[in-house]
Amino acid sequence: MTQSQYSQTPRLALTDAIIDAKARKNLTFEDIAQGTGLSLAFVTAALLGQHPLPADAARVVVDRLELEEDAFFLLQTIPVRGSIPGGIPTDPTIYRFYEMVQVYGSTLKALVHEQFGDGIISAIDFKLDIKKVDDPNGGSRAVITLDGKYLPTKPF
């Protein structure tokens, strides 16, 4: 089963070990990527903590760099992407949600207030659903439902 990271910390530590082994063995990223069946750019990004590797590619990397066996499993996990810390999310998936709120946040606020009155949509009494559906024009679409309880502002 595919596993996902919730923190950059494990992958950052693994990246440090990879860079150390790469230097000790005097290898290039191209040397490490050979035999993985993946592009140099993808493998390099994965080694820097930005992508998961398929099991066969992870095995090649771990064996070539003589990494601990835990690295084999960690290289296959979906990382928290983004290598530049800051206030704005850098993970592409998370950033798209940030972008959506930047573009549609004021619209959502206006429509919530118009339809419900002064208040908020709860993120505590909340349900989230995501479905993958076919796009009639080809490919897939994500249908994301955010179902939060409306909480009116109470004068005091």
Curated annotation (Swiss-Prot):
- Which UniProt keywords are listed? Lyase
User: What InterPro entries does this protein's entry cite?
Assistant: Cyanase, Cyanate_lyase_C, Cyanate_lyase_C_sf, CYNS_N, Lambda_DNA-bd_dom_sf
Which CDD domains does the UniProt entry name for this protein? Cyanase_C (cd00559)
Q: Where is the active site?
A: R96, E99, S122
NCBIfam families given for it? Answer: cynS (TIGR00673), PRK02866.1 (NF002773)
Similarity comment: Belongs to the cyanase family.
Task: Please give the name of this protein.
Answer: Cyanate hydratase
Please give the organism. Answer: Photorhabdus laumondii subsp. laumondii (strain DSM 15139 / CIP 105565 / TT01)
What is the name of the gene encoding this protein?
cynS
